[in-house]
Amino acid sequence: MTAATHTKAQVLAAALPWLKQLHGKIVVVKYGGNAMTDDTLKAAFAADMVFLRNCGVHPVVVHGGGLQISAMLKRLGIPGDFRGGFRVTTPEVLDVARMVLFGQVGRELVGLINAHGPYAVGITGEDAHLFTAVRRDVVVDGVATDIGLVGDVEHVNTEAVRDLIAAGRIPVVSTIAPDANGVVHNINADTAAAALAAALSAEKLLMLTDIEGLYTDWPDRNSLVSQINTDELTELLPTLEAGMVPKIEACLRAVTEGVPSAHVIDGRVEHCVLVELFTDEGTGTKVVNP
């Protein structure tokens, strides 16, 4: 036996306690950031999802697509804007977001996963009443600000997702959803992932980002925290960069609504999901109740 082979065996053996803990459990993964634009990282993420599925864990993927939406808006000559970390969504922007999220980003991820076998099924928040949206405003510099057709999740109907899980599939969810009157909204993928994780009674919520985790005093690299509770995080929230706010709000929502832990991890690292779930050290920042 070579040293490399022995090392691989040791890695697998070390993962056993975590495999036992997560067997049969649902893990919701919010897929976004650089992990969606680098071909190597995309392939690694898809392989991670298939690995989880074949280890008896039930992954549910909720994906973003902000970079791809911005690129398409630019290509079409449609202006785009962000306020409070959320995209301002006019009806014209919504049409583009709907097309890109399900027709481009979602289909690509489904294809990458299904290169390993017939596992992934793509759905949107519109399918089987998965999400019911309610229009939201955001607070910018202390002022409530209208950001257009942007929704929060008012209700989650998990039946379709649970049916897919029971059939051995990996749901891949695009976050477009109607409100109670049928008006379609764009839901921030972080927000949707948190709501879905809570509704599914998931064991964990993983949030892929483009940084190593949560910094309490950015840009001080020494302020990276490995674990933080919801009380501490609530106090920290007003000091965070706008782009991090939806992610941290999502972690808070998931954990306060019953998900045992939420994890902010670095999606720029290959197999970051497996490192977080199946090693003692993990990666990034873990959010728990006090």
From Swiss-Prot:
SUPFAM superfamilies with a match to the protein in the record: Carbamate kinase-like (SSF53633)
CDD domains attached to this UniProt entry: AAK_NAGK-C
UniProt catalytic activity: N-acetyl-L-glutamate + ATP = N-acetyl-L-glutamyl 5-phosphate + ADP
Binding site for substrate: G65, G66, R87, N186
Keyword Cell division: no
GO molecular function terms noted in the UniProt entry: acetylglutamate kinase activity; ATP binding
Protein name, UniProt field: Acetylglutamate kinase
Gene name of the record: argB
